UniProtKB/Swiss-Prot annotation:
Inhibitors modestly slow the asexual reproduction of parasites. Frameshift mutations that are likely to render the resulting proteins non-functional, have no significant effects on tachyzoite proliferation in vitro. This is Formate-nitrite transporter 2. Residues 1-100, 164-189, 259-265, 327-463 are cytoplasmic. Monocarboxylate-proton symporter; active in acidic-to-neutral pH range. Transports L-lactate and formate. Belongs to the FNT transporter (TC 1.A.16) family. Changing G166S: Reduces lactate transport. Reduces sensitivity to MMV007839 inhibition.
């Protein structure tokens, strides 16, 4: 039976005032609330919330656990949430060992080279001589090139490869928020740039030059014209083209991180990449492939001119575009308002399971039972725990009709949760669970819950 990894402690309210475990299964997410000392009264409507702080408190006799399953509704996150995702995304990059960083950057360079090869062969296959019946206009040739090039970025994003141009934005944001050091930023930039160059060189030689694909006259002439044009710009013009290019690339990365599904990532990435291609902007890694392939094929350009009049200004322009026009602007924009609140709602499964807890350490929890008219009936307070008597994981190939652990019942209830991020970057979650007088039957695509032993200490160590 295939199962997802065990639950892990994900979000904590005010210095561990509420233990919330989270995991994912297909379209479902679930939180686990440990609320000892309380048995759910199914005859009345009530609202429960976790709050308080560590304290010694009398332990009641009947602890229980709520497992809340819900389907997330959000497809694209708001600007502040996307910014925080980028921040976390960048911090993870610094945790890569240098060999893995170089390998992933090498693969990104190969992806760019492969896409550049396909674009060159396809666009170059069309003649531009007006007398040729197969001739196409140069703007059409440029669009053909640009429409295919996003394949490289799709491969990079979906495989987690390291592309230097996107890293200029993410690492600067992390540095601005003091989540990485200047040394970590420099290692990431230099490692990804070196790996990208090696990958582009490998692709140009082994996947383009040695394959003989550049031997076609139309393709070779197209490649030669492209190489000559790229070193014919003035230094300042090439620099500004690099600024524009990486602005588009970093906006594409931003959109990809904000999107929650693969189809959305592909769609939001495609158009900015096509835009920089047809706009004539300069991308340092793409140029590494194109100009190196041109030199191998005999393009009438000198290697020193390539470095001085294209690689250097394009590199600096890409850094400025990614760091200043995107990274610094939005770091400045979102830093003062980093504290935010996000609320969502969903229908959820609730399993009441008890007793499951050790009775030694304690954490204060309060719950309020209310009548449908809002009148407070009873207030519950107390508990905690040191270890779980039975954690739960979701198993594949299961149905809700299957047996559920002892003293557990399943119902479908409205559920709201509120996620808050402080300016220090701490994330907290407040949950609201409304139990109506009459439970709703679970839907047909339910999930089976099976025991998984795990102590509170081992869970807390994963934060």
């Amino acid at each position: 039976m295939c199962s997802i990894p065990p639950l892990r402690l994900l979000e904590v309210v005010d210095d561990l005032t509420c233990l919330v475990n989270s995991s994912q299964y297909s379209r479902w997410n679930f939180f686990t609330f440990t609320l000892p000392g309380f048995t759910l009264p199914m005859r009345k409507e009530f609202t429960s919330s976790c709050k308080g702080s560590f304290s010694n408190h009398p332990v009641p006799d009947h602890p229980c656990k709520l497992v809340v399953f819900f389907r997330p509704k959000m497809v694209v996150t708001a600007g502040a949430d996307a910014y925080l995702k980028i921040l976390e995304y960048g911090v993870k990059k610094t945790q890569l060992r240098i060999d893995r960083l170089l390998l992933q950057a090498f693969m990104a360079g190969i992806f760019v080279a492969m896409a550049g090869h396909c674009c060159t062969v396809l666009a170059g296959s069309y003649p531009t001589d007006p007398g040729d019946p197969l001739a196409v206009a140069k703007p059409t040739q440029k669009f053909i090139y640009g429409a295919l090039f996003p394949v490289a970025f799709i491969c990079i994003i979906l495989t987690g490869a390291e592309l230097f141009t996107g890293n200029t934005m993410t690492m600067l944001i992390c540095y601005f928020q003091k989540r990485v050091t200047m040394l970590q930023l420099g290692v990431n930039w230099l490692g990804s740039l070196a790996g990208n160059w090696l990958g582009a060189l490998f692709g140009a030689y082994f996947l383009s030059y040695l394959t003989g694909a550049l031997g076609d006259e139309h393709v070779r002439q197209f490649l030669f014209r492209t190489c000559v044009n790229k070193i014919s710009y003035g230094w300042g013009e090439c620099f500004l083209r690099g600024v524009g290019c990486n602005t588009f690339v970093c906006l594409a990365v931003w959109a990809v991180i904000a999107s929650e599904n693969v189809a959305g990532k592909v769609l939001v990435m495609w158009f900015p990449i096509v835009a920089f291609c047809v706009g004539g902007y300069e991308h340092i890694i793409a140029n590494m492939y194109t100009l190196q392939a041109g030199l191998m094929a005999g393009a009438p350009v000198a290697i020193l001119d390539v470095i001085a009049f294209n690689f250097l200004p394009t590199l600096l322009g890409n850094i400025v575009g990614g760091c200043l026009l995107v990274g610094a602007v939005y770091a400045y924009n979102f830093y003062p308002t980093l504290s935010y609140t996000e609320t969502t709602g969903a229908k959820v499964y609730v399993q009441e399971v008890g007793p499951v807890l050790d009775r030694r350490s304690s954490m204060q929890v309060s719950m309020t039972e209310r009548e449908p008219d809002g009148q407070v009936v009873t207030e519950y307070e107390a508990v905690p725990f040191e270890s779980f008597g039975g954690e739960y994981i979701v198993n594949k190939h299961a149905t809700m009709a299957a047996p559920i652990p002892s003293r557990a019942s399943s119902f479908l209830y409205p559920f709201q949760w509120q996620r808050q991020r402080s300016q220090s970057g701490n994330l907290s979650t407040h949950a609201r669970l409304d139990l109506p007088n009459r439970p709703v039957e679970p839907p047909s695509d339910g999930l089976e819950v099976t025991p998984q032993s795990q102590t509170a200490e081992s869970v807390a160590q994963q934060v």
